[in-house]
């Protein structure tokens, strides 16, 4: 990974609560919906989120995260990693909610995938998103990856504007499968940026 200097630093397991909260913001409530399903009625969905953030492996792991600190507190985070060089087969057992997301990821092989980009509400509008996206480009370049990818909800206009302003362009869309997750969007949008 690139050398990180303040305000950036690699995430640690101690950042699990902040990472879970930021994943909630970035996913527009999808992550807590899934965590609640994993815990069952009366379970602690945030415990599931923290546990996933503390994992050593997997997409949502502190090892794939960089945090941006302000006044010694996590203000924002980036979670990202390289996508495989070839599309991954979509198994029949994959939950329907994930199929459109996997289809879009499969359209962006060999890119550096920005899985999560989020800031706490009080920290928005301060340039953290742009700074973290620039850092993502540095990380990708150091890894020899020539393009970056992001998937965003069509209803997340603020994030979409940020991505467009920083050079990302729409490539494809897939209809969301929501089950009982309440979200105003209807489609997932894949954006790419060539380095």
Which residue ranges define each predicted feature?
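Conserved beta-strand in the GNAT
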Residues: 67, 73-82, 113, 118
């Amino acid at each position: 990974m690139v050398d990180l200097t303040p305000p950036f630093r690699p995430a640690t397991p101690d950042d699990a609560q902040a990472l879970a909260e930021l994943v909630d913001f970035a996913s527009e409530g999808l992550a807590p919906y899934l965590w609640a399903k994993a815990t069952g009625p009366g379970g602690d969905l945030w415990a599931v989120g923290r546990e996933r953030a503390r994992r050593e492996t997997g997409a949502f792991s502190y090892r794939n995260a960089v945090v941006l600190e302000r006044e010694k507190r996590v203000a924002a985070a980036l979670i990202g990693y390289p996508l495989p060089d070839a599309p991954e087969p979509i198994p029949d057992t994959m939950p329907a909610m994930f199929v459109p997301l996997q289809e879009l990821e499969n359209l962006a092989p060999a890119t550096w995938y920005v899985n999560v980009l989020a800031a706490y509400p009080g920290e928005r509008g301060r340039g953290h998103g742009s700074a973290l996206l620039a850092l993502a480009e540095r990380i990708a370049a150091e890894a020899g990856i020539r393009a970056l990818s992001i998937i965003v909800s069509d209803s997340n206009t603020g994030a979409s504007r940020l991505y467009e302003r920083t050079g990302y362009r729409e490539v494809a869309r897939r209809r969301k499968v929501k089950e009982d997750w309440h979200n105003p969007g209807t489609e997932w949008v894949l954006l790419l940026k060539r380095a």
